[in-house]
Amino acid sequence: MCIRDRFHYCPGCNHGIIHRLVAEVIDEMKLDGKVIGVAPVGCSVFAYDYFNCDMYEAAHGRAPAVATGIKRSVGKDTLVFTYQGDGDLASIGTAEIVHAAHRGEKITTIFVNNAIYGMTGGQMAPTTLIGQKATTCPAGRSEEWSGLPIKMCEMLAAVPSSYYIERVAVNNTANIAKAKKAIAKAFRLQMEGKGFTMIEVLSTCPTNWGLSPVEAMNWLEQNMIPYYPLGVYKDKEAK
């Protein structure tokens, strides 16, 4: 499912790992020919170059709305997923993701959170941590001026119609294995017609963080995971 080609992502970027996990799950579920992905504006805008399935490119933040129309058209036998960054989903796309969850749309969102705007040069994102530096907050994010970083899993878990919400990371082999398991469960629940599912993946952006790939992995573990705890935030199947 993942086309073997060189990724355009920066060295140390985790998009390649996440792409591989999504592709492996699709292959293992034997969904070839039954998958449609939606990628909006962001570093992953060229995802259609890497996934060997039908892919749509949505306007900035609008992937859940596009995915809703696709899923309602093609029906339950086709897996429909969105692949979105935090600058997309948690900023310009908050209306679309919140209402898709409220409607209980039977789609899956892969939400990549690297706490910064990557494609546009490292500006502060809604997920940027307090004190974290960005081009639009060179002294570090201030709670007084910008509020606290948004927590999408916690927000969408409170939505009555969401079905399965989990936050994972890909900073080490153990967490990568857990991330794959979470993606597989989200896809399975969608194919069973259960409801809205979202997997948030904590990721690095070495280029815009100004760190080496190894330093970025350590920074994620020491700073992002304490603020964005990993785990299942909602699982109606477990009830």
Region locations from a protein language model:
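Short amphipathic alpha-helices and their capping/turn segments at secondary-structure boundaries
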Residues: 23-30, 185-189
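Active-site cofactor/substrate anionic-group-binding motifs, chiefly glycine-
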Residues: 22, 31, 38-39, 43-76, ...
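Glycine-rich ThDP/TPP pyrophosphate-binding loop and its adjacent helix/strand module
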Residues: 77, 91-108, 112, 116-239
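Residues immediately within or flanking Cys/His clusters that coordinate Zn2+
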Residues: 7-10
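Conserved small/polar residues in nucleotide/adenosyl-binding loops
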Residues: 1-5
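Active-site metal-binding loops of divalent metal-dependent hydrolases
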Residues: 85-88
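A structural signal for isolated positions on well-ordered beta-strands in alpha/beta enzyme cores
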Residues: 36, 81, 108-109
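Active-site pocket-lining segments that scaffold enzyme catalytic pockets across diverse folds
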Residues: 14-23
